[in-house]
A protein has these predicted regions:
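Beta1/beta-strand and adjacent pyrophosphate-binding region of the FAD-binding site
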Residues: 1-11
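Short alpha-helical segment within the catalytic ATP-binding CA
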Residues: 14
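Conserved N-terminal helical subregion
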Residues: 48-128
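Glycine-rich FAD pyrophosphate-binding loop
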Residues: 6, 18-41
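Short, solvent-exposed loop/turn segments at secondary-structure junctions
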Residues: 10-11, 35-36, 121
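Short, glycine/charged-enriched secondary-structure capping and boundary segments
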Residues: 19, 43-46, 128
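Conserved N-terminal glycine-rich FAD pyrophosphate-binding loop of Rossmann-like flavoproteins
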Residues: 34-55
Length: 128
């Protein structure tokens, strides 16, 4: 089977990783109009619950994320000059660019074809 993914953002990359793991013989190609090191947007934050989903679905992605993201489990809530610290709510975060680099790395490790600076104007080129 051949799968073409249009868009090399986090969703397209992670879909490609999980699909390639589930169907290793599948030929998956991602087409992204920007360069591999381009990034738009700011930071990305995941909760502990989301991290547990990464761990259950792709431990390699989880390990990369935990090794490169900042992690915290305390939050300060301030109101009217009073600050309250809340613990037990784990989060991790990084720049969007870092997340894209990690997911691109995982795609390559799984054998996903990545095509950058590939503006797709006509989907018929992918018809079989």
């Amino acid at each position: 089977m051949k799968i073409t993914v249009i868009g090399g953002g986090p969703g397209g990359l992670y879909f490609s990783i999980l699909t390639k793991k589930a169907m290793p013989d599948c030929d998956i190609s991602v087409y992204e109009r920007n360069r591999a090191d381009d990034s738009f947007g700011f930071g990305v934050v995941f909760s502990d619950e989301t991290l547990s989903e990464f761990l259950s679905r792709d431990p390699q992605s989880y390990d990369l994320i935990r090794s490169r993201f900042a992690y915290w489990d305390e939050l300060d809530v301030a109101r009217d000059g009073e600050k309250v610290r809340i613990t037990g709510n784990g989060f991790c975060g990084c720049s969007r660019k870092t997340l894209l680099q990690l997911l691109q790395q995982r795609c390559l490790e799984e054998g996903v074809n990545l095509n950058f600076e590939a503006n797709v104007d006509d989907l018929s080129q992918f018809a079989d």
